[in-house]
Swiss-Prot record:
Family matches, as SMART domains: Elp3
Domain Radical SAM core residue range list: 332-611
Spans traversing the lipid bilayer: none
PANTHER family reported in the protein's UniProt record: UPF0313 PROTEIN YGIQ
One of the record's GO molecular function terms: iron ion binding
Domain of life: Bacteria
The protein's name in its UniProt record: UPF0313 protein blr7973
HAMAP family attached to this UniProt entry: UPF0313 (MF_01251)
InterPro entries: Elp3/MiaA/NifB-like_rSAM, Methylthiotransferase_CS, rSAM, rSAM_horseshoe, UPF0313, UPF0313_C, UPF0313_N
Binding site for [4Fe-4S] cluster: 346, 350, 353
Organism: Bradyrhizobium diazoefficiens (strain JCM 10833 / BCRC 13528 / IAM 13628 / NBRC 14792 / USDA 110)
Co-factor binding comment: Binds 1 [4Fe-4S] cluster. The cluster is coordinated with 3 cysteines and an exchangeable S-adenosyl-L-methionine.
Length: 673
């Protein structure tokens, strides 16, 4: 049974009006005719190809609304050059729902060096260019052009992480809320099942979008009600961190758009307050001035109970791409079709990651029964299944059923992480439920192997030697990807990641368990280059650690400042929002912005690549560490240069939109067209 910090007013499926499910949600008039529909109640417009599977947001929302009795159509990756493709299913009777897809469209389209990507894992054939940049804005505007009087509701991760004024890496400026640019009526942030059901039912009952200002997880433009008292974000940066709270209805006023555009400390303060007001148990509404209007954000949605999670994942998905794609491969589908999501949310709080800002810090778990039913569906219905579950987990592999021991403490907590700088004593870190689940899945008829491919929080895993033994003995296939991200305390503190000692402890336990099981397994560590707070010396020390431990890392990535992440605020402002932000007294952070330095940091991670040796030799000399140039084991790069090498890709300039396309790399791996 779930112990909720705060209960929803009504269960998610309380108003369900089951209708016969469509084989696939229709994407054409012909499919609507076959279903006997004269119109759609709701049309969902998405930047992804339509795959009817719970790993794809439009499928979850579409099937959930179908279960509420609505006729739901899908328009996937429409031609955005005119409004006509948005009229393909006719005028929706209730609303247009618009999502950029499973990824922010700019993250999906450009690398960390702002180079154009050639492919798109969420498109048939893996072809890039099937969605516009900032596609949530473009689609919403085309929906409004197609049918001016139909409400437009934004959702998905792109809208969710751009819900307030935010720094945009690709334009290198602060942009206003996506709700303003899209000219939509409402924005639903986070996992929006509760909100979208209530919005749909109330709009269908005749309410206007502006009247839906009491729904959690909703952002809209509205005036501050007279019965609310305002608490300015500046007041939360007092020595007691705003511990003295005003009684009654209170809204926190963030620094205005015009202020955060000009004042970087004001931007950092807004980021800090937003993240501290993310607990559904104690978060208050936020308001931010945009010109002559107030953008209002209601508190975050109430997490789903296990029964509600089961209801969502048990909906009648076809578990396949829409037939209109024929035999075309959709890479994202091929990657996940034999995997199972068992939970949502993450309490790690890594500053470079936006999972917490979208899914929340509270873990939402499926029951064992629901998970086992899905595995049986994969076994029985998914073509090509050979008995191997490719991955079982969620945003992390091993937070299943972990929670605060005391709901009252959880409801009052404003910590950005439950595991940094140390694991909170109020956190239940037992892996027993997860171990039991693994065993039941392995016992399922027809299942030969269950893999845990990535996402293990090693700082949690070392709390359970039994879990590591279970993992290594049964759920690793040759190697396990793991993410220490760095070795040096400076950048790790800015990332809110544990020290390298925790990784070393996990590696010792992993290796011992592998030896005991008679296996030859390996860890593949991930590292980030150019994260805020990282110095050239930090990267040099990381490279020395890699060489000492005989790692030649291909799995590296350059920090990408994604919308709303705390590390993005550090990158943009040079201020650390993890600490109190006060004019003239804020904790400063070094941000690595120059292309030359960013690529130097990545070159340190690939110290073994001869193409990187010239730039590394030059940097080591400038740092006064020419002693690390030579062929001894304790030296980093040799003095000689093999013929035909030394032309590092780091000298190439990024491609801007409209420029010549080129090959690109992701996490250090060459990706072909």
């Amino acid at each position: 049974m779930d112990t909720q910090i705060i209960a929803a007013e009504k269960p998610l499926m309380a108003q369900a009006r089951p209708r016969k499910p469509a084989p696939f949600l229709p994407m054409s008039r012909a499919e609507m005719d076959a279903l006997g529909w004269d119109a759609c109640d709701i049309v969902l417009v998405t930047g992804d190809a339509y795959v009817d599977h719970p790993s794809f947001g439009m499928a979850i929302i579409g099937r959930l609304l179908e279960a509420q009795g609505f006729r739901v159509g899908i328009i996937a990756q429409p031609d955005w050059h005119s409004a006509e493709p948005l009229r393909a299913l006719g005028k929706p009777k209730v609303f247009f729902g618009v999502t950029g897809g499973n990824m922010d469209s700019m993250v999906n389209r450009y690398t960390a060096d702002r180079r154009l990507r050639h492919d798109d894992a969420y498109t048939a054939g893996g072809e890039g260019g099937k969605r516009p940049d900032r596609c949530t804005i473009v689609y919403a505007q085309r929906c409004r052009e197609a049918f001016k009087d139909v409400p437009v509701v934004l959702g998905g991760i792109e809208a969710s992480l751009r819900r307030i004024a935010h720094y945009d890496y690709w334009s290198d400026k602060v942009r206003r809320s996506v709700l303003a640019d899209a000219k939509a009526d409402l924005l639903l942030y986070g996992n929006a099942e509760r909100a979208v059901v209530e919005v749909a039912n109330r709009l269908a009952a005749g309410e206007a979008p502006r009247e839906l200002d009491d729904i959690r997880g909703v952002a809209l433009f509205r005036r501050v009600p007279e019965d609310y008292s305002e608490l300015h974000a500046d007041d939360l940066d007092s020595a007691d961190e705003g511990a003295t709270r005003q009684k009654g209805a209170t809204v926190i006023r963030l620094p205005a758009l015009e202020q955060v555009e000009q004042d970087k400390e004001a931007y950092a303060r807004a980021s800090r307050v937003l993240h501290r007001e993310s607990n559904p148990g104690n978060a208050r509404p936020l308001v931010q001035r945009h010109g002559d209007r107030d953008l209002w954000l209601n508190p975050p949605p109430i997490p789903l109970t296990s029964d509600e999670m089961d209801a969502v994942y048990d909906l009648p998905y076809a578990r396949a791409p829409h037939p209109s794609y024929g035999d075309a491969k959709i890479p994202a589908w091929d990657m996940i079709k034999f995997s199972v999501t068992i939970m949502r949310g993450c309490f790690g709080g890594c500053t470079f990651c936006s999972i917490t800002e979208h899914e929340g810090r509270i873990i939402q778990n499926r029951s064992e029964g629901s998970i086992l039913r899905e595995i049986e569906k994969i076994r029985d219905k998914t073509p090509g299944f050979t008995g191997v579950i490719s991955d079982i987990g969620g945003p992390t592999a091993n937070m299943y059923r972990m929670a605060c021991k005391d709901p009252k403490v959880e409801g009052a907590c404003r910590r950005p992480s439950c595991v940094f700088p140390e694991i909170c004593p109020n956190l239940n870190t037992s892996h027993d439920d997860l171990i039991r689940l693994y065993r039941k899945v392995r016992e399922t008829k027809g299942i030969k192997k269950v893999m845990v491919a990535s996402g293990v929080r090693y700082d949690l895993a070392v709390e359970s030697p039994e879990y590591i033994k279970e993992l290594v003995t049964h759920h690793v296939g040759g190697y396990l990807k793991i993410a220490p991200e760095h070795t040096e305390r400076g950048p790790l503190d800015k990332m809110m990641k544990p020290g390298i000692g925790a990784y070393n402890q996990f590696k010792r336990m992993f290796d011992a368990a592998a030896e005991q099981a008679g296996k030859k397994y390996y860890l593949i560590p991930y590292f980030i280059a150019a994260h805020p707070g990282t110095t050239d010396e930090d990267m040099m020390n990381l490279a020395l650690w890699l060489k000492k431990n005989r790692y030649r890392a291909d799995q590296v990535q350059t920090f990408l400042p994604s919308p709303m992440a705390t590390a993005t605020a550090m990158y943009h402002t040079g201020v650390n929002p993890l600490r109190g932000v006060r004019h003239g007294g804020s904790d400063k952070v070094e941000a690595i912005k120059g292309l030359r330095q960013r690529r130097l940091h990545k070159a340190f991670l690939r110290y073994h690549d001869p193409d990187n040796w010239p730039v590394l030799r030059e940097a080591l000399k400038a740092m006064g560490r020419a002693d690390l140039i030579g062929s001894r084991p304790d030296q980093l790069v040799p003095a000689h240069q093999p013929p035909g090498t030394g032309k590092a890709a780091g000298t190439r300039r990024p491609v801007r939109p409209g420029g010549k396309t080129q090959r690109f790399t992701t996490k250090g791996l060459r990706v072909m067209k």
